Amino acid sequence: MKMFNVKRLIGALVVCGLTMAVTAAPAHAGLVLGITDGNTVLSIADGSGFDNDGAVGGVGYSGAIGIWTLVMSTGDSDPIEPAPYPHMHLSVSARSSAASVSGNTTGLGDLFVSLTDTDFTTNAAQYKMSIGGSTNGTVTAGDWRDNGNIEFGSGIPLNTVGPLGSGGYSANVSSAWFTTAPALGYSVTIGSLFHNGSAGTSSGDFDLSTTTRAVPEPASLSLLGLGLVGLATRARRLQGKKQ
């Protein structure tokens, strides 16, 4: 994908994170939905007064922001989505009154919608991002892991796709394997950037799921190492007999 889109995704995450730092939220916010057009920033925590989804592990918003006259977005995490975790799903439908302007900060800008959750300890883990939807412009998406356990943290980029469009779009990508996790947990975030080419509606579903595998215990690793040493020794002996 184009580098400027990666920078814009991360920049929007930073804005959402700074807003959360100065906005009151429930004691155990955990799951947070972030929405910005580059001018206005909305952060909706699970269980807050702005959350129109009453379920624990689900957050929702419906309203207007800038030229985006109707934005409907929902986000789910555990315990709604099935294990293993993290497993998050973000759904967005956004209607604009005009074409959006990339990089604009006066209310005409593209729409960035993201979902973040914290306190994950899954190890080992590989993260898959699956997206699909339709647009009259382009859509860019990415997901991140942050070992500082920060909401909207972008410490470790996992996957990025796009810009995709116009028309229908879909993609499936997977990250590298992670074999260690911080003791206090880590956060994950999935984000989507909508650029409308004209007035109209764009939509998308964005899923972040996790694949796990067993991590060998130290004793098992030692046995594996001894096995390799034995095989190497036998190979050298056989080679010596052939000479």
For each feature predicted by the language model, list its residue ranges.
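Short, electropositive, low-hydrophobicity segments enriched in small/polar residues
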Residues: 137, 229-234
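C-terminal membrane-anchoring or membrane-association module
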Residues: 232-243
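Short linear functional motifs in flexible/disordered or boundary regions
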Residues: 127, 227, 235-237
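Short, threonine-centered small-residue motifs that mark membrane-proximal processing/anchoring sites
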Residues: 5-30, 199-230
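Helix-boundary and membrane-interface capping/anchor signal
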Residues: 28-214
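Short, aromatic- and cysteine-enriched interfacial helices/patches
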Residues: 3-6, 239
